[in-house]
């Protein structure tokens, strides 16, 4: 690595983990640039949570090596822990304590005392729009408020890398979008986010890069757009005012007609060049569609194509709720 190349937030080579005779991770390689959102997708049992536990030093890998901001997980676990924060799938909030008390407890764990602890708690309560509920028991908080408090507690120590393990599970759509904005704001401040999620739309909206984990191995990695281009099924849908125009367009372009809705589905990726060519052919033939829409494969199509197991169907159903 040259002196001008930024150090990655996470780099892993050949990570392996087994429980008895069950292989959970089978030689996983990862590199996550600092200041980005990386999303790890996979069906239940694919190894996502195991990966998070290894990278956050909660368990040891059986083989391979990994570094967090240059610190080796095996040789420098304390330095790794000082650089990271973890917000798990299940809230770590103590419902009997107030929001302020939860944050003060976390501050003491990070060796903040007195005015410094109170100042940090106040900053985070304000940042996460919890100041008005600071003195209320966390048990009285809504689901979205509890998740915000949970993340605020993770940030007490100002981590450079945050592991978010299914952070919006159980939240209503408005609370989920509020959490998305919080995550974007964190990254804008320079934090790196390692996100695992059951909601494919969440990864599509947030992640700079996505990896798909299946049966302990990374089966695909790239941006959401790159992954979608790997899957066939893109098409242009044309709708016409008259059956005669539909028939003429089908003769000119081919494709699949739907006489009932006067629609023609023409295979294609929807790129600018191909779309312009399609319209030129229609113009030359004096055929004018009433509507045109471009359809590309969704991330759930990618997921289902790449993970051929029973967990995929459950995953897709959750993504579409």
Positions of the model-derived regions?
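Non-catalytic surface loops within mature trypsin-like serine protease
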Residues: 34, 132, 242, 268-270, ...
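ABC transporter nucleotide-binding domain
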Residues: 179-269, 293
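ABC-family P-loop ATPase nucleotide-binding domain
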Residues: 1-16, 309-321
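Conserved protein kinase catalytic domain
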Residues: 81, 125, 152, 228, ...
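ABC transporter nucleotide-binding domains
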Residues: 7-12, 17-214, 220
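A short linear hydrophobic-aromatic micro-motif
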Residues: 129-130, 256, 288-293
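C-terminal coupling/interaction segments
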Residues: 270-321
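A generic structural signal for short beta-strands and their flanking turns/coil linkers
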Residues: 82, 232-236, 288
């Amino acid at each position: 690595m040259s002196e001008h190349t930024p150090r990655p937030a996470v780099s892993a080579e050949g990570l392996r983990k087994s429980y008895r005779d069950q292989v959970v991770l089978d030689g996983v390689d990862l590199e996550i640039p600092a200041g980005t959102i990386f999303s790890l997708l996979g069906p239940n049992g694919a190894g996502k949570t195991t990966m998070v536990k290894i990278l956050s030093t909660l368990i040891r890998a059986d083989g391979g090596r990994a570094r967090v901001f240059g610190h080796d997980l095996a040789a420098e676990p304390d330095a790794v822990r000082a650089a990271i924060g973890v917000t798990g799938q299940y809230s770590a909030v103590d419902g009997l304590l107030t929001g302020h008390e939860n944050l003060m407890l976390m501050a003491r764990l990070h060796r903040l005392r007195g005015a410094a602890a109170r100042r940090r708690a106040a900053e985070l309560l304000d940042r996460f729009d919890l100041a008005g509920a600071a003195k209320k028991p966390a048990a009285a908080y809504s689901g979205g408020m509890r998740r915000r408090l949970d993340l605020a507690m993770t940030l007490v120590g100002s981590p450079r890398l945050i592991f978010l393990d299914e952070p919006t599970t159980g939240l209503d759509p408005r609370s989920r979008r509020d959490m998305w904005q919080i995550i974007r704001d964190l990254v804008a401040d320079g934090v790196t986010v390692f996100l695992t999620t059951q909601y494919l739309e969440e990864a599509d909206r947030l992640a700079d890069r996505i990896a798909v984990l299946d049966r302990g191995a990374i089966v695909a990695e790239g941006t959401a757009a790159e992954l979608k281009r790997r899957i066939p099924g893109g098409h242009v849908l044309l709708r016409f005012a008259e059956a005669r125009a539909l028939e003429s367009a089908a003769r000119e372009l081919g494709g699949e007609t739907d006489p009932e809705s006067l629609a023609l589905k023409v295979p294609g990726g929807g790129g600018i060049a191909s779309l312009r060519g399609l319209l030129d052919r229609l113009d030359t033939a004096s055929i004018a569609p009433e509507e045109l829409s471009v359809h590309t494969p969704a991330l759930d199509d990618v997921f289902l194509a790449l993970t051929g197991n029973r967990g995929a169907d459950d995953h897709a159903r959750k993504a579409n709720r």
